[in-house]
Regions:
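Active-site environment of divalent metal-dependent phosphoester hydrolases
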Residues: 43, 69-74, 96-98, 157-160
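Active-site metal-binding motif and surrounding structural segment of the metallo-beta-lactamase
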Residues: 44-91
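Divalent metal-coordination and catalytic microenvironments
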Residues: 9, 28, 37, 47, ...
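Conserved beta-strand hairpin/beta-sheet module of binuclear metal-dependent hydrolase folds
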Residues: 2-54
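Short, surface-exposed connector motifs at secondary-structure boundaries
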Residues: 30-34, 57-62, 144
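Metallo-beta-lactamase
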Residues: 97-151
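Short acidic loop-to-beta-strand element that houses the catalytic metal-binding Asp/Glu
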Residues: 24-28, 139-140, 160-161
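Ligand/cofactor pocket segment of small-molecule handling proteins
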Residues: 147-161
Length: 161
């Protein structure tokens, strides 16, 4: 696991998914600590270690912004909320229901990923009260001295921000 500073107050957390350098999680260490993506369920421990490395207790996490629903980017959200139960989880409105009930997502991921599926870990549901369903335009998240503007950018995934 490697945690590195991208710019002042922004850190990358290399989750090590698939056995290599695979950075899929970024921390904005601001008044409201915010993760962009959660990583896969199998990497929750690595993400927690990354938070602690930069001095952010997991329970202080205020927001998790998921760029899209693919398991390597969103699969760890439910597991992270066991350590940050008050965090809001932002996701595109079309895929928000898959966070509360990931059974359909798990089935389609298993089919699409084949033998690699097991390396993603067991995806846990995100409590509905933590989910913030985001429309395609107009959402800005104030995190303190910075703000994150969510820009709808479908392509890699139809729900991509």
């Amino acid at each position: 696991m490697e945690t590195f500073e991208v710019t002042d107050g922004v850190y990358g957390i290399d989750t090590g998914l698939f056995g290599g350098s695979f950075t899929a999680v970024y921390l904005f260490d601001d008044d409201e600590p915010t993760l962009v993506d959660s990583g896969a369920a199998a990497t929750v421990g690595t993400v927690l270690e990354g938070l602690r490395t930069v001095g952010v207790p997991p329970s202080d996490l205020e927001n998790v912004v998921l760029s899209h629903i693919h398991s390597d980017h969103s699969g760890g959200a439910g597991g992270l909320l066991e350590y940050a139960p008050d965090a809001d989880v932002y996701i595109h409105e079309t895929t928000a229901p898959h966070l509360a009930d990931p059974s359909g997502l798990i089935a389609s991921s298993r089919e699409a990923m084949g033998e690699h599926f097991e390396s993603m870990g067991e995806q846990r549901p995100v409590p509905e009260e933590n989910i913030v369903s985001v429309p395609e335009t107009g959402t800005t998240i104030d995190i303190g001295s910075n703000a994150l503007e969510l820009v709808y950018a479908p392509g890699h995934s139809p729900d991509h921000f």
